[in-house]
UniProtKB/Swiss-Prot annotation:
It comes from Gallus gallus (Chicken). Residues 1-21 form the signal peptide. The keyword Disulfide bond applies. Glycans are attached at N94, N168, N223, N261, N299. It is found in: Secreted, Extracellular space, Extracellular matrix. Disulfide bonds join C43-C49, C47-C59, C304-C344. This is Keratocan. Belongs to the small leucine-rich proteoglycan (SLRP) family. SLRP class II subfamily. Pfam families: LRR_6 (PF13516), LRR_8 (PF13855), LRRNT (PF01462). Residues 34-72 form the LRRNT domain. LRR repeats lie at residues 73-94, 97-118, 123-143, 144-165, 168-188, 194-214, 215-236, 239-262, 264-283, 284-305.
């Protein structure tokens, strides 16, 4: 493997797992200090209540089998890494201000979630239920949710209309579950008008999912069995910026002539597929990952999104391709890098071959 660095550093466009929602500190700073004078500072004996963070309750890593009674002042509840099997209404009777619940790494099943208990948490913004025993997306959910994390469960079903009222949801993480194509219907994601990040990686999909919300910016579909990109698929998600399709079964025949020639896509990851040639790309693309495919040669004249003549004289035309990072290792390509690649992509900072 050879890396050619054309510039001293590679600027990353954005963090892979970032979504643009309020942080805990931002929400915490909204509080009026006098707010706490209305509450007593009781603390469940199994948990820790930091004096400097009075609206947080830490009950993680305690071997708990059930959720303790939550004091009324609590906004942030940490219950991860326990043995909890059920979510009942009783512990939350006074917890009307909850914004954040972390229940990752427990033993919660769908049958263990009392009907309606989650939807009654009307101020909840963040719900973490990763690494549990869920077989379907729990319903109903709080209408104000901004992030829903359900990774590494056993989810194979998504109830009809479960997301229809979640207009504020910006991030939905369903990666590493048991989802088949049949679980994702044309109306599955209906209502998710604010969604920006959708993660369905590490499932059992053979097709691109139907009806992705139009405002989606980051779409993660790694580690599925997807073979085909439908014609004009990305016209329905015109804002998609970051697209991951690593570890699928994409071949040259499964990609339409201009399947990835999409001006919004800035980071395209197609590693570990079955491609023998580089698909056409858009001049706006900045990062392209094509490592571990079956590519034998690279023709810069063919893959250049503008004519080589224009690229050579980009100062005159002002339409230089923006590609900065190109990864081609794990293919059958031998150095050196063709000169026409360097002529076309004059902003390249690194090429891995």
């Amino acid at each position: 493997m050879m890396t050619l660095k054309v510039c001293p550093s590679l600027l990353l466009l954005f963090l892979v797992h970032s979504v643009w929602t309020r942080t805990v500190r931002q929400v915490y700073n909204e509080l009026d200090p006098e707010h706490w004078s209305h509450y007593t500072f009781e603390c469940p004996q199994e948990c820790f209540c930091p004096p400097s963070f009075p609206n947080a309750l830490y009950c993680d890593n305690k071997g708990l089998k059930e959720i303790p009674a939550i004091p009324a002042r609590i906004w942030y509840l940490y219950l991860q890494n326990n043995l909890i099997e059920t979510i009942s209404e009783k512990p939350f009777v006074n917890a009307t201000h909850l914004r954040w619940i972390n229940l990752n790494k427990n033993k919660i099943t769908n049958n263990g979630i009392e009907s309606g208990v989650l939807s009654k948490l009307k101020r909840l913004l963040y719900l973490f239920l990763e690494d549990n025993e869920l077989e379907e997306v729990p319903a109903p959910l709080p209408v104000g949710l901004e992030q829903l994390r359900l990774a590494r469960n056993k989810i194979s079903r998504i109830p009809e209309g479960v997301f229809s009222n979640l207009e504020n949801l910006t991030m939905l993480d369903l990666h590493q579950n048991n989802l088949l194509d049949s679980a994702l219907q044309s109306d599955t994601f209906q209502g998710l008008n604010s969604l920006m990040q959708l993660n369905i990686a590490k499932n059992s999909l053979k097709k691109m999912p139907l009806s992705i919300p139009a405002n989606t910016l980051q779409l993660f579909l790694d580690n599925n069995s997807i073979e085909v990109i439908p014609e004009n698929y990305f016209s329905a998600i015109p804002k998609v910026t970051f697209l991951r399709l690593n570890y699928n079964k994409l071949s040259d025949d499964g990609i339409p002539p201009n399947g990835f020639n999409v001006s919004s896509i800035l980071d395209l990851q197609l590693s570990h597929n079955q491609l023998t040639k580089i698909p056409p790309i858009n001049a706006h693309l900045e990062h392209l990952h094509l490592d571990h495919n079956r590519i034998k040669s690279v023709n810069g004249t063919q893959i250049c999104p503008v004519s080589i003549a224009v690229a050579e004289d980009y100062g005159l035309y002002g339409n230089i391709p923006r590609l900065r990072y190109l990864r081609l290792d794990g293919n059958e390509i031998q150095p050196p890098i063709p000169l026409d690649i360097m002529i076309c992509f004059q902003l390249l900072q690194a090429v891995v071959i």
